Curated annotation (Swiss-Prot):
Tissues expressing this chain: Only expressed in melanomas. Weakly expressed in normal melanocytes and benign nevi. Highly expressed at the transition from radial growth phase to vertical growth phase and metastatic melanomas, when tumor cells acquire migratory competence and invasive potential.
Domain of life: Eukaryota
Compartments where located: Postsynaptic cell membrane
Keyword Membrane: yes
Gene: SHC4
Effect of R315Q: Phosphorylation is markedly decreased. Completely reduces the phosphorylation and interaction with MUSK
Ranges of compositional bias, category Polar residues: 471-486, 502-513
Species annotation: Homo sapiens
Descriptive protein name: SHC-transforming protein 4
PTM per Swiss-Prot/TrEMBL: Phosphorylated; the phosphorylation is enhanced by EGF. Phosphorylation at Tyr-424 is required for the interaction with GRB2.
Subunit note: Interacts (via PID domain) with phosphorylated MUSK (via NPXY motif); undergoes tyrosine phosphorylation downstream of activated MUSK. Interacts with GRB2; the interaction is dependent of Tyr-424 phosphorylation and increased by EGF.
Length: 630
C-alpha cells in the first residue's frame, strides 16, 4: 500500500476497483472534496441513500468522483467480471455525460464553491444525516445552477456569437429583433429622439492622440457644453479643472442649434441630425468623416459625443443629450454601424461608392439638380445655414432637404441593445490610411494657429472632405513671394505657388472674395460661367481637356472639370474662405493654379486620383454660352 502512496487518487481507485482482491477493503486517501471527517469505505458502504434521488449506493464508492453516479455500480463480487468487459462500459460511462467531468475539473482548480456546496448540503432537508463524501462528490458531479448561470453569462458576453453583427461570411442572426435591427442599419437607419447640445472645435487630429487623450477630449467637450447650455443635466455638479493640453486641442464652441430636439438617424452610411420642428438638416456626417465616438463620464452618463468633420465646423466634437438611459443604446448603435460598415468594406470596397451614390439619388427631384459627386467631396456634404466659418451663400431649407439621405420614418428605440462598449473608433479610417483609399477628396482644417507639427501629417490626406480651409505660409516662407495680383490676366503669372508650411496661420478672406474671384474668372477663356455637370462632361472630348465652371446649383462654388482616362473628374477650386489651393500649395487665383500645373506638366493629385491639364476647352466652343451672350 505504501508503494502506491505517491499515485493520484484516480490511479489508486482504478487499481483497487479493477485488480484488487474481492475480499480486500482499501482506505481512501484524504481529499479536499471529502468532508472533514475521514470515513472509511466500510463506513461509507453502510450509509443510507446517496444524493437527492435516493439511488442505490455503489459497492465501490471511491469511483464516485471520477464516474457518473448513476453508472458507477460495478458487478457483484460473487461473479468476478473479466477486464475486457469493463473497458467498453467505462468508455460508455465517459461519453455518457462529459459535462460532469468538466465540472469536476473546474472544482479541482482551487475554486471556493466546495465549502458553499457543503453548506447547501447541510441545509438541504432532503439529505439524510451528515453529508458523506459520496454525497458531496456526487452533488459536485453536476455544477450548481448559480455557478452555471454565472459562467453562461460571462461566456455570452465574451463570445463572438453575442455580437449581433455578421462575420466575414454570411450573417448569423439569433433572433428576429437582431435581423430587424441590421436591416435598419443597412437601409434607412435607426432613429432616436435626442437633444442636440452643440459642438466644440477639435484643432488636432484624433489619430495624433492616444486612446486616453481622445476620451478626455470628448468628456471635456461634454462638460463645456453642459456648462454653456442652460438646463443641461451635467451642469449642476462641479467638475475638476481641465487638463492643460486640452486647451490646445479644443477650440471654440458653436451653440447655434444647442438645446434643439432633433431626430438622430444612424446608418452604415451616415449620421444625420434633423430638427423635429421644421425638418431642417442640422448636420449630415458621412460615416467616413466620423473618427471617434464616446459616452460621458460618471457625472454625464446621459450624453454621447462623436468627433466628425464637415465643411462648416471642420473637425468638431458634437454632443447629444439622451434621456431615459438612451445614451448607451445610441453609442452601441454607432459602434455597430462602424463595425458593420468596416466588414462590408473588407468584403467589397466598392460598397462605399454605391452607398454614397444612394445618398444623392433619393427622389425624382435629384435629376433636376446637379449631383455634387466631386472626387474630393462626399455627396450630401452641402453645409447647412450657419456655422463657425460659413461664408457660403445661404440656401433655403427646402433645398437642404434634398441632401437628406433618409426619409421620415417612425421613431424607434431599442432598450435592450446595450451589449457593446461606450467608446468606439472608426476602423475604416485607419484602413484607408494604409492604402485602400476611396477617391473622394481632401481633408479640411479650420484654424492652424495652435496646430502642432505632429498632426500635420494627415492634413489633406483623408479622402473625405472638401478642401475648405485656406492656409497661407508665414511671411518669409517660400522665398518671400509677392502677394496676390488682383489685376491682369493670371495666365501670365509665372511665379511659384506658396507652399503649405507647418504652423501656418489662416487669414480670413474679405467679404468680397467670392465676387472678386468671379470677376477674375470672366477674363479666362476656359471659364464657362454657370454650367451643369452633364453639360460640362459633354464638352470634354479627349484626355487632358479641362474647363472651369460655376456650379449651377451652388452659387459661389467653382469647379474644375477635366477628363482623365476617359472618366470625367470634378475638383472644387475655391473654399469658403476664398482661397484657391491644392493639397500642398496655395495659389493666388484659379488662373495661377492652372498655369502652374500646365507649365510644369504636373497633374492635380488628390487622394490617389489625378487630373492632367493639357488643353483648355475655350468658351468659344460652348454654343449655349455664345447664345446667352447674344
Amino acid at each position: 500500500m505504501r508503494e502506491r502512496g505517491q499515485d493520484s487518487l484516480a490511479g489508486l481507485v482504478l487499481y483497487v476497483g479493477l485488480f484488487g482482491h474481492p475480499g480486500m477493503l482499501h482506505r481512501a486517501k484524504y481529499s479536499r472534496f471529502r468532508n472533514e471527517s475521514i470515513t472509511s469505505l466500510d463506513e461509507g458502504s453502510s450509509g443510507g441513500s446517496v444524493g437527492n434521488k435516493g439511488s442505490p449506493q455503489p459497492p465501490h464508492p471511491a469511483l464516485a468522483p471520477h464516474l457518473p453516479t448513476e453508472d458507477a455500480t460495478l458487478p457483484s463480487q460473487e461473479s468476478p467480471t473479466p477486464l475486457c468487459t469493463l473497458i467498453p462500459r467505462m468508455a460508455s460511462m465517459k461519453l455518457a455525460n462529459p459535462a460532469t467531468l468538466l465540472s469536476l475539473k473546474n472544482f479541482c482548480l482551487g475554486t471556493k464553491e466546495v465549502p458553499r456546496l457543503k453548506l447547501q448540503e447541510s441545509r438541504d432537508p432532503g439529505s439524510s444525516g451528515p453529508s458523506s463524501p459520496e454525497t458531496s462528490l456526487s452533488r459536485s458531479g453536476t455544477a450548481p445552477p448559480p455557478q452555471q448561470d454565472l459562467v453562461g453569462h460571462r461566456a455570452t458576453a465574451l463570445t463572438p456569437d453575442s455580437c449581433p453583427l455578421p462575420g466575414p461570411g454570411e450573417p448569423t442572426l439569433r433572433s428576429r429583433q437582431d435581423r430587424h435591427f441590421l436591416q435598419h442599419l443597412l437601409g434607412m437607419g435607426m432613429n432616436y429622439c435626442v437633444r442636440y447640445m452643440g459642438c466644440v472645435e477639435v484643432l488636432q487630429s484624433m489619430r495624433s492622440l492616444d486612446f486616453g487623450m481622445r476620451t478626455q477630449v470628448t468628456r471635456e467637450a461634454i462638460s463645456r457644453l453642459c456648462e454653456a447650455v442652460p438646463g443641461a443635466n451635467g451642469a449642476i455638479k462641479k467638475r475638476k479643472p481641465p487638463v492643460k493640453f486640452l486647451s490646445t486641442v479644443l477650440g471654440k464652441s458653436n451653440l447655434q442649434f444647442s438645446g434643439m430636439n432633433i431626430k438622430l438617424t444612424i446608418s452604415t452610411c451616415s449620421l444625420t441630425l434633423m430638427n423635429l420642428d421644421n425638418q431642417q438638416i442640422i448636420a449630415n456626417h458621412h460615416m467616413q468623416s466620423i473618427s471617434f465616438a464616446s459616452g460621458g463620464d460618471p457625472d454625464t452618463t446621459d450624453y454621447v459625443a462623436y468627433v466628425a468633420k464637415d465643411p462648416v465646423n471642420q473637425r468638431a466634437c458634437h454632443i447629444l443629450e439622451c434621456h431615459n438611459g438612451m445614451a448607451q443604446d445610441v453609442i452601441s448603435t454607432i459602434g455597430q454601424a462602424f463595425e458593420l460598415r468596416f466588414k462590408q468594406y473588407l468584403k467589397n470596397p466598392s460598397l462605399n461608392t454605391s452607398c454614397e451614390s444612394e445618398e444623392v439619388h433619393i427622389d425624382s427631384h435629384a435629376e433636376e439638380r446637379e449631383d455634387h459627386e466631386y472626387y474630393n467631396e462626399i455627396p450630401g456634404k452641402q453645409p447647412p445655414v450657419g456655422g463657425v466659418s460659413d461664408m457660403r451663400i445661404k440656401v433655403q431649407a427646402t433645398e437642404q432637404m434634398a441632401y437628406c439621405p433618409i426619409q421620415c420614418e417612425k421613431l424607434c428605440y431599442l432598450p435592450g441593445n446595450s451589449k457593446c462598449s461606450s467608446v468606439y473608433e472608426n476602423c475604416l479610417e485607419q484602413s484607408r490610411a494604409i492604402g485602400n483609399v476611396h477617391p473622394r477628396g481632401v481633408q479640411s482644417q479650420r484654424d492652424t494657429s495652435l496646430l502642432k507639427h505632429t498632426c500635420r501629417v494627415d492634413l489633406f490626406d483623408d479622402p473625405c472632405y472638401i478642401n475648405t480651409q485656406a492656409l497661407q505660409s508665414t511671411p518669409g516662407s517660400a522665398g518671400n513671394q509677392r502677394s496676390a495680383q488682383p489685376l491682369g490676366s493670371p495666365w501670365h503669372c509665372g511665379k511659384a505657388p506658396e507652399t503649405v508650411q507647418p504652423g501656418a496661420t489662416a487669414q480670413p478672406a474679405s467679404s468680397h472674395s467670392l465676387p472678386h474671384i468671379k470677376q477674375q474668372l470672366w477674363s479666362e477663356e476656359c471659364y464657362h460661367g454657370k454650367l451643369s455637370r452633364k453639360a460640362a462632361e459633354s464638352l470634354l472630348v479627349k484626355d487632358g481637356d479641362f474647363l472651369v465652371r460655376e456650379s449651377a446649383t451652388s452659387p459661389g462654388q467653382y469647379v474644375l472639370s477635366g477628363l482623365q482616362g476617359g472618366q470625367a473628374k470634378h475638383l472644387l477650386l475655391v473654399d469658403p474662405e476664398g482661397k484657391v489651393r491644392t493639397k500642398d500649395h496655395v495659389f493666388d487665383n484659379v488662373g495661377h493654379l492652372i498655369r502652374y500645373h500646365m507649365d510644369n506638366s504636373l497633374p492635380i493629385i488628390s487622394s490617389g486620383s489625378e487630373v492632367s491639364l493639357k488643353q483648355p476647352v475655350r468658351k468659344d466652343n460652348n454654343p449655349a454660352l455664345l447664345h446667352s451672350n447674344k
